[in-house]
């Protein structure tokens, strides 16, 4: 039976459960449940703390897991990323008191508070910077005001929380994170087919969230220009219409770009442009 780790709480929990449900797997009915057996798919799900999931997978106790890329990197567990899931995006950056221009080199000899000490130490070592890293499990932003640290390294969203504590982010991102499906680095043939099947199902759901199917009628004389705008994954589908001067075109397009793509098609003469949701896809 395939053994899969799923976040039991936090921002990754519900989207992960939703994707697995859309992929045809059983959901837990009580948030207190720590395991759920799905006999129809021969899978057992374990609901664990997101920060611990990479450790369980890396040890070989579990076959697959869903966690954050930053959490997997911080764990230093021997895991590899199988698939990016398209939710839970964040950046991990340094921040320090506002009022001056900061650079990573300014951290030399200073105290840095973070919930991700391994990530920070690796980054500092790569830059040749010596600093004191202080591990905190939460509310890292307040550490500077309380005199515990001179700077922090933390997940940064809009920057609003940093601003409330008179901090400003600086330097490049230490880690651009999102939810990922992971497996043990060097995982062998055991349960390989089952791992592949779950990954394919999940990838199909993720793809359906990121792409749309676009259908439109196109004058033949601008078909080359139209297919440059909508090349599809491999190639667009082109079918004749009753009017021989026109063809029907169907192609997958990125959801985030659909409005600009429709604008371009309309500008070159395409008609009846229709965007449709897709739920699943297999490659």
From Swiss-Prot:
Known pathway: Amino-acid biosynthesis; L-histidine biosynthesis; L-histidine from 5-phospho-alpha-D-ribose 1-diphosphate: step 1/9
Cofactor(s) listed: Mg(2+)
Activity-regulation annotation: Feedback inhibited by histidine.
Entry's localization field: Cytoplasm
CDD domains linked: PBP2_HisGL1
Keywords of the record: Amino-acid biosynthesis, ATP-binding, Cytoplasm, Glycosyltransferase, Histidine biosynthesis, Magnesium, Metal-binding, Nucleotide-binding, Transferase
Entry's Gene Ontology molecular function annotations: ATP binding; ATP phosphoribosyltransferase activity; magnesium ion binding
Pfam families linked to this entry: HisG (PF01634), HisG_C (PF08029)
Domain of life: Bacteria
InterPro entries hit by this protein: ATP-PRT_HisG_long (IPR020621), ATP_PRibTrfase_cat (IPR013820), ATP_PRibTrfase_CS (IPR018198), ATP_PRibTrfase_HisG (IPR001348), HisG_C (IPR013115), N-reg_PII-like_a/b (IPR011322), N-reg_PII/ATP_PRibTrfase_C (IPR015867)
Record's catalysed reaction(s): 1-(5-phospho-beta-D-ribosyl)-ATP + diphosphate = 5-phospho-alpha-D-ribose 1-diphosphate + ATP
Main location: cytoplasm
Its EC number(s): 2.4.2.17
Any single GO BP term: L-histidine biosynthetic process
GO CC terms of this entry: cytoplasm
Family: Belongs to the ATP phosphoribosyltransferase family. Long subfamily.
Self-association state and partner proteins as the record states: Equilibrium between an active dimeric form, an inactive hexameric form and higher aggregates. Interconversion between the various forms is largely reversible and is influenced by the natural substrates and inhibitors of the enzyme.
Function statement: Catalyzes the condensation of ATP and 5-phosphoribose 1-diphosphate to form N'-(5'-phosphoribosyl)-ATP (PR-ATP). Has a crucial role in the pathway because the rate of histidine biosynthesis seems to be controlled primarily by regulation of HisG enzymatic activity.
Protein name as catalogued: ATP phosphoribosyltransferase
Species of origin: Mycobacterium sp. (strain KMS)
Designated gene of the protein: hisG
């Amino acid at each position: 039976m395939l053994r899969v780790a799923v976040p039991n709480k936090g921002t990754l929990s519900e989207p992960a459960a939703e994707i697995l449900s859309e992929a045809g797997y059983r959901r837990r009915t009580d948030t207190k449940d720590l395991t759920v057996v799905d006999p129809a798919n021969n899978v057992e799900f374990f609901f664990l703390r997101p920060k611990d999931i990479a450790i369980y997978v890396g040890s070989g106790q579990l076959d697959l897991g869903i966690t954050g890329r930053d959490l997997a990197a911080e764990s230093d567990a021997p895991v590899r990323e199988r698939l990016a899931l398209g939710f839970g995006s964040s950046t991990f950056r340094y921040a320090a008191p506002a009022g001056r221009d900061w650079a990573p080199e300014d951290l030399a000899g200073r105290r840095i508070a973070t919930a991700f000490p391994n990530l920070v130490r690796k980054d500092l070592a790569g830059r040749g910077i010596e600093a004191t890293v202080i591990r905190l499990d939460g509310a890292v932003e307040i550490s500077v005001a309380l005199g515990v640290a001179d700077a922090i390294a933390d997940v940064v969203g809009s920057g609003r929380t940093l601003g409330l504590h008179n901090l400003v982010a600086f330097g490049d991102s230490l880690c651009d994170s999102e939810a990922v499906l992971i497996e043990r680095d060097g995982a062998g043939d055991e349960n390989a087919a089952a791992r592949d099947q779950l990954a394919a199902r999940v990838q199909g759901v993720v793809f359906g969230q990121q792409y749309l199917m676009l259908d439109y009628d196109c004058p033949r004389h601008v078909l080359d220009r139209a297919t440059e705008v909508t090349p599809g994954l491999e190639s667009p589908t082109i079918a004749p219409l009753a009017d021989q001067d026109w063809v029907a075109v169907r192609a997958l397009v990125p959801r985030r770009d659909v409005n600009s793509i429709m604008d371009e098609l309309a500008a070159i003469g395409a008609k009846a442009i229709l965007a449709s949701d897709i739920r699943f896809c297999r490659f």
